[in-house]
Amino acid sequence: MARRIPIRSDEVVLTDTLSVPVRPMIGCIGTAPAQGTGSTIMPSYSFGGNMDLTDAAPGSTVHLPVEVDGALLSIGDLHAIMARGESSFVAIEAQGTAIVSVDLIKNTSPLRAPRIETDREWIFVGLGDPVQDSITAGYEDMFDFLVRDHGWNRDDAYVVMSALAHSELGGPTGSTDPDPLHPMAAVGAVTVHRLPKSVLT
């Protein structure tokens, strides 16, 4: 099944009776791997790719590992709107132009996976197959961020994460062997783990 979805006056016309405001986002964003080959389609990798995260949106900062000279940043797959989790394996795709600024941050702890920074949150991206591995990876990255990068006591990090760090499904493209014909049966996933910036002040 295919359907053309009109976008009119900053609204997405989902059905004859339902229109919603546009919420633009970038589905694919990543850098090049140090070895081997990568794909901006699927799955996602530690250096990014087709993560389909709604937080990769205007005003946010995406932090990516850099493994090669020049980074070779790739951006695409623009969406007019997408629900978190992308349950049908497709968003409301749209043509457009992404205006971004790029900074190289040196002399920091290496990133194990992408992170997204908003005005209010640090968002840690978990990648893995099965999905439990994705969740574990996201938790471990957040824990390292608090303990290694910010000098927290380990016990304090556990307590704050248990109380305030929310987790959710990001997109279904974390599988190492995705089945496009059965998107709702994805065996791996991208997960996101949210830490309020207020805990760092």
Could you say what each language-model-derived stretch is?
Residues 1-57:
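Intrinsically disordered, low-complexity linker/loop segments enriched in Gly/Pro
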Residues 70-80, 170-173:
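Short, Lys/Arg- and Gly-enriched loop/turn segments at beta-strand edges
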Residues 75-92:
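Short, compositionally biased
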Residues 147, 156-201:
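TerminUS-proximal long segments
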